[in-house]
Amino acid sequence: MKALHFGAGNIGRGFIGKLLADAGIQLTFADVNQVVLDALNARHSYQVHVVGETEQVDTVSGVDAVSSIGDDVVDLIAQVDLVTTAVGPVVLERIAPAIAKGLVKRKEQGNESPLNIIACENMVRGTTQLKGHVMNALPEDAKAWVEEHVGFVDSAVDRIVPPSASATNDPLEVTVETFSEWIVDKTQFKGALPNIPGMELTDNLMAFVERKLFTLNTGHAITAYLGKLAGHQTIRDAILDEKIRAVVKGAMEESGAVLIKRYGFDADKHAAYIQKILGRFENPYLKDDVERVGRQPLRKLSAGDRLIKPLLGTLEYSLPHKNLIQGIAGAMHFRSEDDPQAQELAALIADKGPQAALAQISDLDANSEVVSEAVTAYKAMQ
């Protein structure tokens, strides 16, 4: 089996690429970073530090790389059995034209063996969004062929991969936590279902997408925002602060009550899942900076994301949300000189005031009780 993976960054190498290569799949990375491409093609291997209770070093081997903006990547799409991505939500649209060209070439070459494409991004139904971009880039006469022969498979991914603090300055070395979860929608595949250790198949993907978004992502973001306000440097430092931990755990329990109501998750199992996530945040080997985790606050405060979406669920089911409100207020305070969204957020609040600014970013009603609660919490944090 041959696979092409877009994105040779830390998540690409440390998570999805590693699982594919470990499964014995012939793997090629596609990226724009020439330093990383050259290193992968010179060595055909790299090291992954897997850290949890203990630390182990795994070697991923038998890999190569191509530029994601040249002809090589188009040729590969015409040949491979699987395409995966870990490029970030914004970049999906940029890689779509190359994928479309590759699919046209595949059709022209008469390659009718099934191809499955899986976007492994921190977003809800990312592959469906990628499919939209690809379809827009395809000529009309190729669309029906693509619908017949290409599966666009949505997935939920979960593994904390902080920027590498490698002492060796090796561009390929990466550190990841022991925990990993890659859940894919088995109803969307073309051809036989793949058997890849570490990839779980489900016919109820949205339950798992929201479980991860409402728990890991919600908890991670709130830890970062409250941690930064309290002067902590890392996620571990922040979650070991009892005041912050109480709010983070409370917020995950509030969002969890929505999940239990919506999808019928077992309450005891979900409580254990929350405990596991708190333990992951405490991992002493992961030097995960609160500023990195908190960046892009406008996206994280949008209606479909990790803070507002669970809040909307609590309103739908008339459930408590006081800790989620604390997290939203913390996000409104996020300031970073390195993050354009943080600067835009600050300017918006300065210009319109917190009430109108939050309503604009989140699509919540400016005159609603929840916006009023969030503004009160925001002002109390000043």
Swiss-Prot record:
<dbReference type="InterPro" id="IPR013328">
    <property type="entry name" value="6PGD_dom2"/>
</dbReference>
<dbReference type="GO" id="GO:0008926">
    <property type="term" value="F:mannitol-1-phosphate 5-dehydrogenase activity"/>
</dbReference>
<dbReference type="InterPro" id="IPR023028">
    <property type="entry name" value="Mannitol_1_phos_5_DH"/>
</dbReference>
<dbReference type="InterPro" id="IPR036291">
    <property type="entry name" value="NAD(P)-bd_dom_sf"/>
</dbReference>
<dbReference type="GO" id="GO:0005829">
    <property type="term" value="C:cytosol"/>
</dbReference>
<dbReference type="Pfam" id="PF01232">
    <property type="entry name" value="Mannitol_dh"/>
</dbReference>
<comment type="subunit">
    <text>Monomer.</text>
</comment>
<comment type="similarity">
    <text>Belongs to the mannitol dehydrogenase family.</text>
</comment>
<keyword id="KW-0007">Acetylation</keyword>
<dbReference type="InterPro" id="IPR013118">
    <property type="entry name" value="Mannitol_DH_C"/>
</dbReference>
<keyword id="KW-0560">Oxidoreductase</keyword>
<dbReference type="Pfam" id="PF08125">
    <property type="entry name" value="Mannitol_dh_C"/>
</dbReference>
<dbReference type="GO" id="GO:0019592">
    <property type="term" value="P:mannitol catabolic process"/>
</dbReference>
<protein>
    <recommendedName>
        <fullName>Mannitol-1-phosphate 5-dehydrogenase</fullName>
        <ecNumber>1.1.1.17</ecNumber>
    </recommendedName>
</protein>
<feature type="modified residue" description="N6-acetyllysine">
    <location>
        <position position="269"/>
    </location>
</feature>
<dbReference type="InterPro" id="IPR013131">
    <property type="entry name" value="Mannitol_DH_N"/>
</dbReference>
<keyword id="KW-0520">NAD</keyword>
<dbReference type="InterPro" id="IPR000669">
    <property type="entry name" value="Mannitol_DH"/>
</dbReference>
<dbReference type="InterPro" id="IPR008927">
    <property type="entry name" value="6-PGluconate_DH-like_C_sf"/>
</dbReference>
<dbReference type="InterPro" id="IPR023027">
    <property type="entry name" value="Mannitol_DH_CS"/>
</dbReference>
<feature type="binding site">
    <location>
        <begin position="3"/>
        <end position="14"/>
    </location>
    <ligand>
        <name>NAD(+)</name>
    </ligand>
</feature>
